[in-house]
């Protein structure tokens, strides 16, 4: 058992899977839950995985951060639509000189946390994971699982490979989770957006799985156009994404099992969509420096309309 104590904020498809793997490998893990608390506190966690199913009959489950111990590493695995809760959730459980590991999609999340806790170390994690929460405490891991880690510094300046990244990498790799270490977190975030913007966005707008988007000539072309706009957005912030990476993402998705994206699942279940973190923030960062991304701009406005109507039955009206 390693000496680092982990807290998992958001025990869903992502946090539940990685937290369960860490505990199974001997880490001291503490899970914050909301609606699933009673079930998980009583019965633990079940992970059904392509790599082998397993059950954790007992876990450290909490429904209140005030009851949780101070932890060395706090894993933020909430949807970004819940980030307004972080000023209340994070300060009670992060040790002085502790680490906040942000396993969230999109751009700008590390900056938000640095404003809340300027004294802690922040590491961004980019997860390449196909996983769904089937029920309370029941996670179905379909494919992949790799995490790419990069440490945050003010303005997303390049931090290189730090000792803190190496320590977390060791714990996760001991748990059977593949880790890649990044010298440049901002480049990594933009690379992740190459996949996230087209597939998450179009899956909602067009009511389609990833395999359907890739099987049709017209939608595949649209996916590729959106990817090249993400490349242009990255360039506007001084980061270069090679064309070969875009081709790799297209090939990777063709080989993937048919997948309903996380944004599509949220839409189908009438939950708030991560439109701002995944689409809005990158779009606005590019616009701030005079770079227009017309396809992404169109996608953003479509998603804002669908998200508002889906959850409230009302249209978004300027105040």
UniProtKB/Swiss-Prot annotation:
SUPFAM superfamilies listed in its UniProt record: 6-phosphogluconate dehydrogenase C-terminal domain-like, NAD(P)-binding Rossmann-fold domains
Chief localisation class: cytoplasm
Catalysed transformations (reactions): (R)-pantoate + NADP(+) = 2-dehydropantoate + NADPH + H(+)
Top-rank EC class of the record's enzyme: oxidoreductase
Gene Ontology CC, one term: cytoplasm
GO BP term (any one): pantothenate biosynthetic process
Stored InterPro entries: 6-PGluconate_DH-like_C_sf, 6PGD_dom2, ApbA, KPA_reductase, KPR-Related, KPR_N, NAD(P)-bd_dom_sf
E.C. designation(s): 1.1.1.169
Binding site for NADP(+): 10-15, 105, 274
GO terms of molecular function: 2-dehydropantoate 2-reductase activity
Catalytic residue positions: 192
Subcellular location: Cytoplasm
PANTHER family for this protein: 2-DEHYDROPANTOATE 2-REDUCTASE (PTHR21708:SF26), PROBABLE 2-DEHYDROPANTOATE 2-REDUCTASE (PTHR21708)
Function: Catalyzes the NADPH-dependent reduction of ketopantoate into pantoic acid.
NCBIfam families: apbA_panE (TIGR00745), PRK06249.1 (NF004887)
Protein's recorded name: 2-dehydropantoate 2-reductase
Organism: Nostoc sp. (strain PCC 7120 / SAG 25.82 / UTEX 2576)
